[in-house]
A protein has these predicted regions:
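Bacterial N-terminal signal peptides
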Residues: 17-30
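Soluble metallo-hydrolase cores and metallopeptidase-like ectodomains found primarily
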Residues: 38-43, 122, 129-170, 250-351, ...
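Catalytic-core environment of secreted peptidases
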Residues: 49-96, 118-122, 172, 176-201, ...
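Extracellular/luminal Protease-associated
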Residues: 51, 129-249, 253-256, 318, ...
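Noncatalytic luminal/extracellular "stalk/propeptide" segments of secretory-pathway proteins
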Residues: 68-191, 293, 305, 309-312, ...
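Metal-dependent peptidase/peptidase-like ectodomains
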Residues: 128-132, 142-144, 169, 246-276, ...
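Acidic/histidine-rich catalytic neighborhood of metal-dependent amide-processing enzymes
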Residues: 196-202, 206, 210, 227, ...
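His/Asp/Glu-rich mid-to-C-terminal helical/loop segments that flank catalytic regions of hydrolases
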Residues: 367, 371, 485-556, 560
Length: 563
């Protein structure tokens, strides 16, 4: 099947006159000097290698029942890692892990919890039903966690000086159990934060981090489809069963994290004699103060604990010109959720779209770029990460122990949940608006005949939930390649509708399986974009930098002072 794009004057897969113009623009926006202009002949070779047949074969294998959902620490994940290594070697990549192999060891702890949650309020005892009304997990590798604490509603649980927002008001919260709203106040008031575009302060991970900083015993996150941006079924499937942590994390006072349904939260608050809706409305104001509910929660979590090692699979394409050890990193996670609760008689969470598709794109990009020859100035590292679904753990391990100093990483480009629905006329690259990579993103999109689309669902906070994010927090500029919305030969709203159907019916469910009807023209577009991005960045002599108003600007300045 030919490499297809939307209607455009650029020939797909080769550098036409439009492509040469795009390269010229790329040189301008990256600050590359004349001697670092990408070799257009080499780029043509790279773009010509990937095929829909090989992409289909990768997805079909990685999403097969044989691999049992590729959960970290399982035989299926080990098979997937070996498969990726073999494809890297076949392409001609060299080992890229710090120890000189293809495998970066990631030491993990798996905790499988069996929790109970009882709330005492106004002489009434409420026993919440596991999975139906709550899920909970220990924050450390503990076989037994028992926590008993007073429940305090802390609104959105945010302390953000840059936004002049503090939900805590210096309230002493040591040993308390915090009841929190998910997302941030911009969800309901477009005049605060980034409006409906979720900030990191709106993510569940930030809220647990902040609760730990304040010495809380636990955190109860209130789920709604709107605020979490996914249904309760995703919570059930993602936070039940084995929960994985990096071995050796610093112990913290926060004993547990939990999600509860809004219905359960309403019952608790109502029993305490408080108007739930009024309380939530007040939480959207800067003058909000924590509300003590005169209620106690007792949680008991007995867990099975196992320690194991998983791997990031890392291959590198070495430059023969650069002498500063600078690199460009391309990522896609290969793990998924393994075997879990059966739905419609199927208990294998195959993860075809999430993220066998992204790994297929990474492998196709690697094969193409390897055929192009040595990159002009920077080496290119291809990183298939483990344990993304458990909290970006593989990417975090890479950041903690990188093959080169972090300051030598020019940029990271991530592919997660690739487009298997067909060609588009536009493309999403999350993070483009945050750094000078934005101009490069526009240029390479134009070279593929595509329009660069802003995040169509900023309220979901997708930027904070995939493997590029640990790079951004460390100060490295990033791009997250997403799926466009304007599909060729489809009705105008088809892309949005298909995304909603996927999230409701397949995301983190056994039904995310290989489909012989997948259409790979869109994924081929993403491979071409990743190829162009990587090759151009590898040819540049300057570092991308964060924009002045980007929340990662300070991290970037700490990483590379003076740039």
């Amino acid at each position: 099947m030919p490499h297809m794009t939307g209607p455009a004057s650029c020939s797909p897969g080769i550098l036409s006159r439009c492509g040469v113009a795009a390269v010229t623009l790329v040189v301008a926006v990256t600050g590359a000097s004349a001697q670092s202009v990408p070799d257009t002949t080499a780029l043509q070779r790279a773009l010509a290698v990937p095929t829909t047949r090989t992409i289909d074969a990768h997805i079909k294998f990685l999403a097969d029942d044989l691999l049992e959902g590729r959960a970290p620490g399982t035989r299926g994940a080990a098979i997937a890692a070996r498969y990726i290594q073999s494809r890297f070697e076949e392409a001609g990549l060299q080992p890229g892990a710090p120890d000189g192999t293809f495998f970066q060891q990631v030491r993990l702890v798996g905790v499988t919890p069996s929790p109970s949650l009882v709330v005492g309020v106004a002489r009434r005892t409420m026993v919440l039903q596991y999975l139906e009304e709550f899920v909970a997990w220990p924050q450390g590798p503990d076989r037994s966690v028992i926590a008993d604490g007073e429940i305090v509603f802390v609104g959105y649980g945010i302390d953000a000086p840059a936004w002049s927002w503090d939900d805590y008001k210096l309230e002493p919260l040591t040993g308390k159990i915090l009841l929190m709203l998910v997302n941030d106040p911009g969800l309901r008031d477009s005049s605060v934060f980034n409006g409906q575009a979720m900030t990191y302060y709106g993510s569940w991970s930030y809220k647990l981090e902040q609760a730990a900083r304040l010495g809380a015993a636990g955190a109860l996150l209130i789920h709604t489809n709107e605020s979490a941006t996914y249904p309760w079924t995703v919570v059930q499937n993602s936070w039940s069963g084995q929960q994985i942590q990096i071995e050796g994390q610093t112990p913290q006072t926060l004993r547990f994290g939990a999600w509860i349904t809004e219905r359960a939260a309403r019952q608790i608050v109502r029993a305490a004699g408080i108007d739930y809706d009024l309380m939530v409305r007040r939480a959207a104001r800067r003058d909000f103060h924590p509300v003590t509910l005169n209620a106690h929660a007792v949680i008991d979590i007995a867990s099975r604990v196992r320690r194991f090692t998983s791997v990031n699979v890392i291959g590198r394409l070495e430059t023969d010109h650069g002498d500063d050890g600078e690199i460009v990193v391309l990522t896609a996670h290969y793990d998924h959720r393994g075997i879990g609760t059966a739905l419609n008689g199927d208990s294998i969470y195959n993860g075809a779209q999430d993220n066998a598709s992204g790994v297929a794109g990474l492998l196709a990009t690697a094969a193409g770029l390897a055929a192009a020859g040595p990159p002009p100035n920077r080496s290119i590292y291809f990183v298939a990460t483990t344990a993304k679904e458990s909290g970006l753990l593989g990417a975090t391990a890479f950041i903690r122990s990188p093959p080169v100093p972090l300051a030598r990483i020019a940029a990271a480009i991530n592919l997660d949940g690739a487009n298997v629905w067909g060609a588009t006329r536009d493309v999403v690259m999350l993070g483009a608006e945050l750094s000078t990579l934005g101009k490069l993103a526009e240029a390479v999109a134009r070279a593929e005949g595509l329009t660069l689309l802003a995040d169509p669902n900023p309220e979901t906070g997708s930027f904070f939930h995939s493997d590029h994010f640990p790079f951004a927090r460390a100060g490295v500029p990033v791009l997250f390649l997403g799926t466009g919305r304007d599909f060729v030969n489809r009705p105008p709203d088809w892309g949005r509708t298909e995304t909603e159907k996927y999230l409701a019916n397949r995301y983190h469910q056994p039904s995310d399986e290989y489909d012989p009807n997948f259409r790979y023209e869109g994924l081929m577009q993403q491979v071409a974009l990743m190829t162009r991005l990587a090759w151009t960045l590898a040819g540049s002599l300057v570092f991308p930098v964060w924009n002045e108003d980007a929340e990662f600007r300070q991290a970037g300045e700490r990483l590379r002072p003076g740039r």
